């Protein structure tokens, strides 16, 4: 079995972490499906750990797991890792920027700037519905990502 050093030698020139940013129902997961990529997804990790993608009682454990898996992907040389979660505030995004700096890679944000009412309407047609009041609270908390946070690129999807 190869050691970590051999994996590091296979690294691509500049690895990237790409964070999805936006409300539930804004199109983050659909966007990634269309790209044909498998992201590190907070919903998928919740489902894996608790057999329930809506279980918010394990929030810290879910994001700790995502960051662990992200670091492992960087160490073995994966060129791009997409992270699918809401990432509403600079504080929620900061750990990924720190990881990117530690590993010498770029970190980008893809911001889904979709009106709240459209997100609520889309969300109401899902299997796992986030209550409208929770969506409103999330929208009030949402701070659009900026390059000043440490992103090498911010892409806005409308």
Q: For each of these PLM feature ranges, what is it?
A:
Residues 39-42, 104-106, 131:
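Short hydrophobic/aromatic-enriched beta-strand-loop microsegments
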Residues 48, 52, 87-128, 137-146:
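ATP-dependent NMP and nucleoside kinases share a basic, alpha-helical "lid"
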Residues 72-76, 102-104, 148:
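Conserved catalytic network of the ASCE P-loop NTPase/AAA+ motor domain
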Residues 16-18, 79-83, 107:
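Generic beta-sheet signal
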Residues 80-87, 152-158:
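Phosphate-binding beta-loop-alpha motif at adenosine-nucleotide cofactor sites
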Residues 26-81, 91, 116-120:
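Conserved substrate/cofactor phosphate-moiety recognition/catalytic segment
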Residues 2-21, 26-29, 34, 38, ...:
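Conserved GTP-binding G-domain of TRAFAC-class P-loop NTPases and closely related GTPase folds
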């Amino acid at each position: 079995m190869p050691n970590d050093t051999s994996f590091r030698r296979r690294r691509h020139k500049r690895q990237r972490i790409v964070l999805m940013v936006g409300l539930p129902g804004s199109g983050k997961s659909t966007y990634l499906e269309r790209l044909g990529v498998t992201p590190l997804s907070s919903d998928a990790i919740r489902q894996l750990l608790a057999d329930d993608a809506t279980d918010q009682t394990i929030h810290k454990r879910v994001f700790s797991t995502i960051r662990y898996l992200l670091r492992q992907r960087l160490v073995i040389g994966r060129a791009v890792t997409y992270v699918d979660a809401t990432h509403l505030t600079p504080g929620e995004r900061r750990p990924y920027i720190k990881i990117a700096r530690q590993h010498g890679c770029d970190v980008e944000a893809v911001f889904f700037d979709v009106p709240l009412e459209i997100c609520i309407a889309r969300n109401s047609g899902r299997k796992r519905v986030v209550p409208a009041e929770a969506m409103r609270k999330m929208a009030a908390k949402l701070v659009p990502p900026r390059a000043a946070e440490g992103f090498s690129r911010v892409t806005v999807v409308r």
